[in-house]
Amino acid sequence: MDNSFLLVVVGMCVVIVAVVALGYYQKQKRMEEMRALAARQGYRYTERDDALAGALAEFALLSRGHSRRATNVLSTEADGIAATVADYQYITGYGKNQHTHRRSVLLLESGQLDLPAFVLRPEGIGQKLAGLLGQQDIDFDSQPDFSDAYLLQSPDEARIRSLFGHEKLAFFARRPGLCVESQGRRVLYYRSNRRLSPEDIPSFIEDGLAILLLLAGERAAAPTGEPDGLAGLDAVLADLSVDEVAV
């Protein structure tokens, strides 16, 4: 056997082993960081939740691809609001053409919610989704900045126009790049196609809660009660101004 060929084979094997080892190290490091965050903040930590992955895939925004996974799941509940953050992953394509997509997502659930179903995502990257939903973009002539920044779709346009008043439209127009989807009592939120660093997770949850309160028509007082996990969620909800959300 040609020595040069043997060296090439050995070199390729070394590279493959190094890539696998690096991937394993990064995975373990993130798990440890998320566990530490859960311990500090009082969240519940689950390494992997297949049921959650299935529930997230029911949202149009996360319905693409296959081999869906929800890992490093952080969850808590307070004052009737359940908050769940996860590293959501899915794959598009197969074989040499496959690509893995990862992002941090927040799922908020409350039996007190009764929002119309809708999908809100940045304009310009939602045309494929528009075809999937079979619905047209709902524009607002009074808020061209919002309509230029976002694609808004719903099977109930009348309710959406009633829900998205001036304050809500201005809020989102000032914060381009957000993705929000409502299924009535459940709201999905994420703001980028990447995983957030652990230190950004608490503010990510607070931003999502502020958006939830805005959509629900609440701006200040939250239900009273002892918080369970979010280190004073009732105080956060009471003090958080939707105009101060950092995105």
Model-derived regions, located:
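Transmembrane-cytosolic junction motif
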Residues: V17-Q41
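Core hydrophobic alpha-helical membrane-spanning segments
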Residues: V10-A18, G111
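Charged, low-complexity intrinsically disordered regions
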Residues: E32-A55, A60-V247
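Feature marks short, highly hydrophobic, charge-poor N-terminal signal-anchor/signal peptide-like helices
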Residues: M1-G11
